[in-house]
């Protein structure tokens, strides 16, 4: 095995070391990893034509996840922060639910409901969100006859999780601190 590693280019070995470090951090107990910042080389995503928010707007985001999500610049910064922590699935699920509610066609709604369920809700889903068993069961029952409200309970649980967990971490992050400079 060592001969195989020695033959790899230096950049591959460096990348492997970075991944090993990140995985080590992720495998730590959550309490000890709360304030760790994982290095993230990309700059925060910024919408093409979004204006930089005022200091007053940015300060409001500390108190209101709604205001943060409604501001395109804030949304992009929050999304970049979550990506840096490998935890963007909650925001992606929330956005998928918002888009799902806008679907008018019952056929398209059923297709999208299945896609959301398979991507975020079912056990071992690629981007499985952290919801309790009761919420999962209710959501599954709602999908027998999909409606715009099929994911409401799960979406509310994930929103509350982002509000109580992700938002405070975002406000303590370098992403947010850069915005209030």
Curated annotation (Swiss-Prot):
CC annotations in GO: cytosol; intracellular membrane-bounded organelle; membrane
Primary location recorded for the protein, binned into one broad class: cytoplasm
Keyword Membrane: yes
InterPro entries membership: RGS (IPR016137), RGS_RGS5 (IPR034956), RGS_sf (IPR036305), RGS_subdom1/3 (IPR024066), RGS_subdomain_2 (IPR044926)
Any one Gene Ontology BP term: negative regulation of vascular associated smooth muscle cell proliferation
Chain ranges of the RGS domain: 64-180
Tissue expression profile of the protein: Expressed in heart and muscle.
Any one GO molecular function term: GTPase activator activity
UniProt subcellular location: Cytoplasm; Membrane
Keywords annotated in UniProt: Cytoplasm, Membrane, Signal transduction inhibitor
PANTHER family associated with the record: REGULATOR OF G PROTEIN SIGNALING, REGULATOR OF G-PROTEIN SIGNALING 5
Free-text function comment from the UniProt entry: Inhibits signal transduction by increasing the GTPase activity of G protein alpha subunits thereby driving them into their inactive GDP-bound form. Binds to G(i)-alpha and G(o)-alpha, but not to G(s)-alpha.
UniProt name for this protein: Regulator of G-protein signaling 5
């Amino acid at each position: 095995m060592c001969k195989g590693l020695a033959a790899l280019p230096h950049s591959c070995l460096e990348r492997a070391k970075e991944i090993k470090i990140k995985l080590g951090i992720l495998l730590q107990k959550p309490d000890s990893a709360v304030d760790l910042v994982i290095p993230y080389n990309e700059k925060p995503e910024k919408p093409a034509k979004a204006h930089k928010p005022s200091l007053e707007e940015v300060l409001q985001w500390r108190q209101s996840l709604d205001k943060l999500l409604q501001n395109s610049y804030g949304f992009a910064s929050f999304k970049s922060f979550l990506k840096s922590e490998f935890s963007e699935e909650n925001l992606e699920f929330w956005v998928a639910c918002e888009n799902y509610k806008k679907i008018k066609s019952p056929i398209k709604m059923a297709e999208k409901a299945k896609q959301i369920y398979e991507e975020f809700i079912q056990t071992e889903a690629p981007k499985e969100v952290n919801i309790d068993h009761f919420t999962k069961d209710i959501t599954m029952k709602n999908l027998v006859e999909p409606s715009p409200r099929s994911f409401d309970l799960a979406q509310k649980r994930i929103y509350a999780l982002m509000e109580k967990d992700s938002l405070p971490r975002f406000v303590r992050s370098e992403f947010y601190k850069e915005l209030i400079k």
